[in-house]
């Protein structure tokens, strides 16, 4: 009997796979198919004339890796608003509004971490300290604790590195902001742009424990440390409470090719091939036309999606968005002299 049951399961799975048409990840056909499904989001072109290898490299997070211990949350008596946007809650913290660009490198795991860490330093010092924490420092110096640099990494390892080794400051490519700005240039998503083409190639830059010329203090003096790092349970309310009390978090989820085409609305996977795991920064939540969503910042520049941001279905662990949330608290004692 068992073989009948197994055969039936295989046939159902095969039937489901065949019921979803196959499209090239960036095709007009995929855009049109999504927009005809009467779903909760709209598709359009964000990338033109780029290699599929580049698109897959953008998704550089290893899902299901080791996690730090969960922090115990007491949310029973906490009244959470129907909608929340960290940009509005902490308007004096400019990094919350920022969208970065990881370039041709699978460094999303590092960007999601340093973006949320930057936000939390500002929030937990009551905006007395505002710093862009360096994705370059984390990407290049974390080593095997975090994974494999531009070839992918673990968000949990990134937060652990912050607490153990610290991270220096560093802004966007060619910004000359901070100790170690990002060294990988943005690449051109569009046909007639001025930036270099997007490819799936490129090595991880070398770890350098020296700040760029003209910057002071020294590399060692510029380090910012975390007090602790932890996982957040996949409970919708626990994640909301964590953001509400402590600021944006890093999350990760499975990316399918239809997500690459996101323009507006609340993303729900419709069709398309699996591209890989992707880490992002979750900064709020809300409800749009009756559909609950997470408000999320991506790291694919502002010409992707909704000015670099997107919304994704909340409360159903859609594409695993609620299963890989990590966060941490800054060590505020290091800033007492500045405060």
Swiss-Prot record:
SMART domains: Pept_C1 (SM00645)
UniProt source species: Macaca fascicularis (Crab-eating macaque)
InterPro entries in the cross-refs: Papain-like_cys_pep_sf, Pept_asp_AS, Pept_cys_AS, Pept_his_AS, Peptidase_C1A, Peptidase_C1A_C, Propeptide_C1A
Membrane topology: Peripheral membrane protein
Protein known as: Cathepsin B
Family the entry assigns: Belongs to the peptidase C1 family.
Organism classification: Eukaryota, Metazoa, Chordata, Craniata, Vertebrata
Assembly and oligomerization: Dimer of a heavy chain and a light chain cross-linked by a disulfide bond. Interacts with SRPX2. Directly interacts with SHKBP1.
Residue positions, PTM N6-acetyllysine: 220
Segments forming a coiled coil: none
Position of the signal peptide: 1-17
Gene (name only): CTSB
Record flagged with keyword Mitochondrion: no
SS bonds (residue pairs): 93-122, 105-150, 141-207, 142-146, 179-211, 187-198
CDD domains tied to this protein: Peptidase_C1A_CathepsinB
Enzyme class name: hydrolase
């Amino acid at each position: 009997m068992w073989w009948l049951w197994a055969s039936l399961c295989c046939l159902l799975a095969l039937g489901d796979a065949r019921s979803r048409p196959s499209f090239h990840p960036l095709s007009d056909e995929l855009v049109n198919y999504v927009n005809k499904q009467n779903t909760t989001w709209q598709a359009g072109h964000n990338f033109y004339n780029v290699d599929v290898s580049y698109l897959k490299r953008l998704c550089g997070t290893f899902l299901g890796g080791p996690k730090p211990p969960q922090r115990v949350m007491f949310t029973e008596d906490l009244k959470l608003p129907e909608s929340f946007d960290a940009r509005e809650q902490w308007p004096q913290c400019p990094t919350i509004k920022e969208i970065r660009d990881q370039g041709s490198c699978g460094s999303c795991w590092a960007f999601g971490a340093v973006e949320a860490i930057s936000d939390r330093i500002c929030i937990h010092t009551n905006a007395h300290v505002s710093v862009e924490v360096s994705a370059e420092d984390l990407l290049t110096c974390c080593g095997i604790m975090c994974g494999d640099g531009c070839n992918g990494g673990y968000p949990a390892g990134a937060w652990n590195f912050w607490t153990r080794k610290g991270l220096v400051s560093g802004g966007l490519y060619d910004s000359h902001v901070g100790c170690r700005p990002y060294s990988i240039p943005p690449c051109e998503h569009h046909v007639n742009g001025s930036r270099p083409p997007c490819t799936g190639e490129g090595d991880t830059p070398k770890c350098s424990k020296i700040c760029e010329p003209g910057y002071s203090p020294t590399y060692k003096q510029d380090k910012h440390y975390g007090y602790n790092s932890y996982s957040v349970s996949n409970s919708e309310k626990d994640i909301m409470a964590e953001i509400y009390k402590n600021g944006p978090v890093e999350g990760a989820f499975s990316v399918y090719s239809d997500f690459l085409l996101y323009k507006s609305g609340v993303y729900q996977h419709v069709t398309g091939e699996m591209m890989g795991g992707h880490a992002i920064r979750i900064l709020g939540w809300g409800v749009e036309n009756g559909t609950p969503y997470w408000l999320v910042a991506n790291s694919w520049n502002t010409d992707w999606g909704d000015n670099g941001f997107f919304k994704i279905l909340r409360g159903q662990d859609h594409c695993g968005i609620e299963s890989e949330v990590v966060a941490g608290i800054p060590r505020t004692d290091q800033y007492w002299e500045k405060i």
